Amino acid sequence: LDAAELMNVGVNYLREHVADDVRMHYTYINTDGPANVVPPYAATNYFVRSGKWERTLDASERVDNCARGAALMTGTRVEIERVTCNKEMKPNRALAEVFYEEMQKAPVPEYTEEEIKFAEKIAENAGLGGKAPEELFTGLEPLESEPVPLAIGTDVSDVSHTVPAVMLSAACMCKGTPLHHWAATAQAGMGIG
């Protein structure tokens, strides 16, 4: 556990020394025993991603080095298992145009009075500013003239290197809602989410 803790400290400092779009997430996945005893084994799961595959690989190797260094500091051993490494999305303009044409045929959302009031409360309590229904987008944005790069690699972006793929971005919460925020969770359980 001490080595895992030291690794996490190292990775948290590493955040200042990687590209701005690099994201490093982790969790402990296997620790047991009472709180006053250092367990003999600990495991963490790291998820490293960015908008470019090369930056993801570089940051992943640096995270691995944090694990190796922590093992050296504590006189323990480390086993590293690389499960996957996501590439950036491969743009496909032809498929995007077909997809957009079909989206233009789809009905736009219509919100109930209850959903609009809920959105107003969320916007107010989460400090998002503005007022519903302006906070509830009901249209279709124009198709971008150039591909919009994703901030991070995903499983879909990996697939796009094997088969043609596009990704849809849809409004499913009040404008300005941060994704990793209680307001996003609250809206996911409501009709607007």
Regions found by a protein language model. Give the residues of each.
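Zn-dependent metallopeptidase/amidohydrolase metal-coordination segment
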Residues: 117-193
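Midchain, well-structured core segments that form catalytic/ion-binding scaffolds
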Residues: 1-125
